Amino acid sequence: RSTLFPYTTLFRSHEGIGRTGVVGVLRQGDGTRRLGLRADMDALPIVEATGLGYSSCHGGRMHACGHDGHTAMLLGAARYLAATRRFDGTLVLIFQPAEEGQGGAEAMLADGLLERFPCDALFGMHNMPGLEAGHLGFRAGPMMASQDLLSVTLEGVGGHGSMPHLSVDPLLAASSAVMALQSVVARNVDPQKAAVVTVGALQAGEAANVIPQRAVLRLSLRALDGQVREQVLQRVRQIIELQAASYGCQASIEHYPAYPVLVNSVEETEFARQVGVELAGAEQVAADRLGQRPVVERG
């Protein structure tokens, strides 16, 4: 907001959209087109010790995430557009909070973002560590994977490690489920389509000689197609429930849908690619390399 302040005579600034989102609107000429440029941000739990004038005002929180670089880039674009005004129509600059976790985009949409600021097309960009510095990448169609998070609790009967016959071991059931889940993509998903099932945590017990009462698994699922996503979700649920039952345990599954597949429209993607070629040169546009494989590494 403070960066846009010097240009308030040019930008109409709107704050508090989706709680902390900011939108800047800039008009030029008589054009009727309305294009949106969107950037996001995500603070990290880091103590900022840079001493810079724009350092975080909140202890233990720093805008050091890669997504915060997106906001810095859009602020740079705002200053350039306000200074040069080389366009005809309306530009809507969307500064979205909470790219991950809290779902800032959903909050802004629920707050009437697109009803208040309708756009003919929306453009955004994401830094890509896999691309060489100075290069741009474009891909029409599925670009970034959906993400679903699962928290699984397996309930058994705890007991002493010397008397396993009097217990129902949820850790054994959880271990078996982890191994069985490796078959979901390998034996259920079309090899020409992409999906990932990751068990990122298995938590159970505290003592070497005690069989725990419960075990907890935390999973993330990713897919680049809606049908594949549903297929993976169904098989994961089925495997967990049946593996738990086979060891005499009860399974409860909490599902947290995070994000759908990001799908880039063909026409707008090609338009952006052509602009990239004009600005940076064809040799700097990595359309072929990026186009070979969509991105499943997300958040």
Residue locations for each model-derived region?
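Short, small-residue-biased leader/transition segments that mark boundaries at the very start
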Residues: 3-10
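Short beta-strand-to-loop junctions in surface cap/lid or active-site-entrance loops
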Residues: 24-31
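Histidine/acidic-residue-rich, glycine-tolerant segments that coordinate divalent metal ions
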Residues: 22-23, 43-62, 68-69, 81, ...
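Short, well-structured beta-strand/strand-turn elements
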Residues: 12-17
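DPxDG-like acidic metal-binding loop motif
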Residues: 71-78
